[in-house]
Amino acid sequence: MVSYTLGDIKAAELKSRLAMTMKGTVLECDNARAIHFLASTALMREGAPFDADFIVKELRFLNSKGTPYPWDMNYYSRVFDRVVTQNIIAYYAKHHNLNMVAAAQGMLERRRLPKNDHEYTYSPGYSRYANYDEYFGSLDSMTANQLRDYIVFMHEKHDNDVLAQFILQQNKYRNPSYFNDLLGTKLIAEGRFSEALPVLKKVPLSYVNGLGIALIMAHRDYKKPRWFFKQRVKDIYDLGVDEELEKVSLKYNQKITFCEDMSRLEQRYELAKLANNATRPELAMQLAVRYYQASCYGDCWYLTHYDKPCDDSTRAWEKDFAQQAMTYLDVAKKDVKLKQEALYARAYVQLNVTTNGSWYGYDFKEYQQLLK
């Protein structure tokens, strides 16, 4: 183990293989086998031939060593976690196999959490879970197309891949409502509103009502301009918890109405653009309001995300909703009646994209420059 820690993986593999031939207590023999497994998979990670049969055999061995201790106090569980995290997941990440990376992370989360633990519902609406769960983080980092591929991957048999079979047997979470909601939300974030509709319509309202974002969804409206006022909700983020507000019952899924609204408005805008219609600036203002509200900076961030960190920004694979709002505001400002609001909105958007509305990021000189 000293050789492995010092970075000499080949020496660690050789010494641990020799140690496995020696006599000792059960724990000593298991230690030698665990170190050999760790070193061998590290070599595979670095380019040695990948032996899936060997990996599955060793993972099954670790699984068989049940103890009465919880995961973090169980030596064999920690070996399992370390090998999978450091070597197996790293191997698949190196080979850009996002499906196996996500599946393996899901397997580890499944092992760490008791079956009856509330957190195991994998509800992305619980921000505390989204913040600390690597499985959700992996899924959340995928594009919509990548997530769709992963959903297909989860339901395949993988007859020719024993490791994929093993991992997916350990990671059995397949709730269609969860994955359809996640996929539909990603499609919205990419600006693919028409594609998102049939996916989101598969999600029962009862499921949406159980998400942590339901409270916020019930009390915010994406049609109200963010640059005029903030729609406050009495939840744990705004002045404590209001128990009465927590017991909300959604009448409809706002993600669906948003997609319908955006699809209709964008079609009308394109027609007005072709005909050089006078309604174009007004339609542009309506689209700007909606795009900004649904961005990670707006009050209705829950339409495209499951949490709102104070330092969030548009992700590389998402459509830049704030920038799209600016594009529409540039059209709206050409109308005399809308010019004042459009110019004010542009200054507001530019400032908040820089600071995300955080007081500690406020720079008065920069603000003055933006207003010029």
Regions found by a protein language model. Give the residues of each.
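Extracytoplasmic/secretory-pathway proteins
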Residues: M1-K372
